[in-house]
Design a protein with these regions (language model features):
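A structural helix-start
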Residues: 156-164, 190
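Donor nucleotide-sugar recognition loop
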Residues: 55-71, 107
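A recurrent flexible, glycine/aromatic-enriched loop bordering the glycosyltransferase active site
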Residues: 13, 19-50, 61-62
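Catalytic donor-sugar/metal-binding loop of nucleotide-sugar-dependent glycosyltransferases
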Residues: 59-61, 71-91, 95-97, 113-134, ...
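A conserved acidic beta->alpha catalytic loop
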Residues: 183-196
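Short, acidic, metal-binding catalytic loop of nucleotide-sugar glycosyltransferases
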Residues: 168-178
Length: 198
């Protein structure tokens, strides 16, 4: 299939004669992670025909236009490529959101909430979006019909006591009833762990 969206890793820079810093090595595309924070941010390239179809930037999301576009693109294509190389240098200055510890543009983080909320509505998910624990992150409180089954996946290799503590804690403390515990066995060798599995 033809690629419709490319994004790259990035770092930050103050001036051309200063060293670059704070590299951001991004993961490959993850819609769930994207909904939690705009980890893609810069540098993004979109296929023109797709952008024409989507209508480009929308002023409703001023400060988070890139986030809105990335979410809309993700709704319309699976042909997304991450190039794991630093190909973008984000210039840091006092009025830039490049300074992660600043409130230089709080409206940018506020605009992320309706961008995600509208995305959820477009894809048919019910939930409420709020700010996460860290600046620039978001939490979605999904609304479910009924009590869907939750799979708790625990990888393990020869860790009987740790695994037992984990499983016992789930069994004792969980107030949710419709769940399963899946233990992913990773080449354990001790008899003790296989006895515990029984």
């Amino acid at each position: 299939p033809e690629v419709e969206f490319i994004y790259t890793d990035e770092d930050k820079i103050t001036t051309l004669d200063q060293p670059r810093f704070n590299p951001h090595f991004k993961p490959d595309f993850s819609l769930d992670f994207l909904r939690a924070n705009n980890y893609i941010c810069h540098f993004s390239v979109f296929k023109k025909e797709l952008m024409d179809k989507l209508g480009g930037e929308r002023s409703k999301y001023d400060g988070a236009q890139d986030f809105d576009i990335i979410l809309r693109v993700a709704e319309n294509t699976k042909n997304i490529i991450h190039i794991p190389k630093v190909l973008y240098h984000w210039r840091v200055h006092p009025n830039s959101t490049a300074q992660a510890d600043t409130q230089a543009k709080p409206y940018a983080f506020e605009a992320g909430i309706p961008a995600i909320q509208d995305h959820l509505e477009r894809v048919g998910l019910k939930g409420t979006v709020e700010h996460g624990a860290s600046l620039g992150t978001y939490r979605i409180r999904y609304q479910f019909e009924g009590t869907p089954k939750v799979s708790i996946i625990i990888p393990n290799k020869d860790e009987k006591e740790t695994l037992k503590t984990c499983v016992d804690s789930i069994l004792e403390k969980s107030t949710y009833k419709n769940y399963e515990i899946v233990i992913v066995e990773n080449n354990s060798t001790t008899e003790e762990i296989f006895e515990y599995y029984k």
